[in-house]
């Protein structure tokens, strides 16, 4: 973990879910520093590299890039050094769908184009970090097997009082702080299916050397609002916001500004590989939004 003060929060969250923590060891490490990593890797046979910087608050490009790129490089080298059997990277669908073309349906062969106008720093960093990993595998041919999992928008109930970016946004929706729905389209997957996909990938020979998108279904933001409205969250937006309004408000609101390059653009996916190799999906995106809303309200 990156902050030892969160140990109790992690323990409590797991215990509430009925999980035993008897065999759980938490070691504080920093993606940008060497200390502590060799200790953390002692006796480790499988690595799930899930850590990434993501925030709705303004941060510099460097604050996104360095942890992603240096962190990925560090994990690769440590996995090699400590004879790890398997490394699973949590990448993202954002490393897939950014394009300068009119393409709307994507698969694992697609890569985000870093020259896409308006591409977010987070999207760039995830794309570059994943490419770094695949390049390392090709160049060094390490003994460990490598798999990249690329989830779409991850949504679902929170396990603690700490709200991540997704759940904080859901809270704003149910509180009526988002009065209208921007014409924004994205794929989603339930957080529990993302966790299950990682577990199902461990020691699974079918996923070695594979890039797998986790994408249960796609929704327009207005559809998300309608789902929550019908579930009793009457402050959720059901009317669509005109693109010109989003652009105008985006001059002052940085979270809306990030949506501008994607207004009106569909981003769909053929997620057959996840179904065939990992047994996805057990929950719908609709369930994910409803459970998230109930957990934060």
Predicted regions and their residues:
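Active-site Tyr-X1-5-Lys
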Residues: 116-146
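NAD(P)H-binding glycine-rich loop region in Rossmannoid oxidoreductase-like domains
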Residues: 4-8, 14-70, 78
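Alpha-helical substrate-binding/gating segment
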Residues: 170-179, 184-212, 217
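Conserved Rossmann-fold NAD(P)-dependent oxidoreductase catalytic core, especially the SDR/UDP-sugar
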Residues: 49, 58-122
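Glycine-rich "substrate-gating" loop/helix at the edge of Rossmann-like oxidoreductase active sites
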Residues: 118-121, 156-162, 179-192
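Glycine/proline-rich active-site loop of Rossmann-fold NAD(P)-dependent oxidoreductases
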Residues: 140-144, 156-168, 201-212
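Mid/C-terminal beta-alpha module of Rossmann-like enzyme folds, strongest
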Residues: 197-257, 276, 285-297
């Amino acid at each position: 973990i990156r902050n030892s003060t969160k140990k109790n929060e992690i323990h409590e969250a797991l215990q509430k879910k009925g999980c035993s923590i008897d065999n759980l060891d938490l070691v504080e490490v920093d993606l940008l520093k060497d200390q502590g990593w060799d200790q953390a890797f002692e006796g480790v046979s499988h690595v799930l590299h899930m850590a990434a910087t993501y925030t709705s608050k303004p941060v510099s490009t460097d604050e996104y890039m360095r942890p992603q790129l240096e962190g990925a490089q560090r994990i690769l080298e440590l996995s090699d050094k400590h004879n790890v059997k398997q490394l699973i990277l949590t990448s993202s669908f954002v490393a897939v769908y950014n394009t300068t073309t009119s393409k709307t349906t994507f698969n694992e062969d697609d890569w985000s184009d870093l020259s896409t106008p308006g591409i977010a720093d987070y999207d760039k960093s995830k794309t570059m970090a994943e490419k770094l990993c695949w390049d390392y595998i090709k160049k060094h041919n390490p003994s460990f097997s490598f798999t990249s999992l690329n989830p779409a928008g991850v949504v679902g109930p929170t396990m603690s009082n700490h709200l991540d970016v997704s759940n904080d946004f859901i809270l704003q929706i149910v509180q009526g702080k988002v009065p209208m729905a921007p014409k924004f389209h994205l794929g989603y997957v339930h957080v529990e299916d993302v966790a299950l996909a990682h577990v199902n990938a461990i020691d699974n020979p079918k996923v070695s050397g594979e890039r797998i998108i986790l994408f249960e279904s796609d929704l327009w933001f207005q559809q998300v609002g309608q789902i929550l409205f019908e579930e009793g969250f009457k402050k959720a937006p059901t009317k669509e916001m005109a693109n010109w309004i989003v652009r105008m408000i985006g001059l002052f609101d940085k979270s809306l500004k990030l949506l501008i390059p994607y207004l009106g653009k569909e981003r769909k996916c053929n997620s057959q590989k996840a179904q065939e190799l990992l047994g996805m999906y057990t929950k719908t995106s609709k369930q994910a939004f409803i459970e998230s809303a109930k957990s934060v309200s």
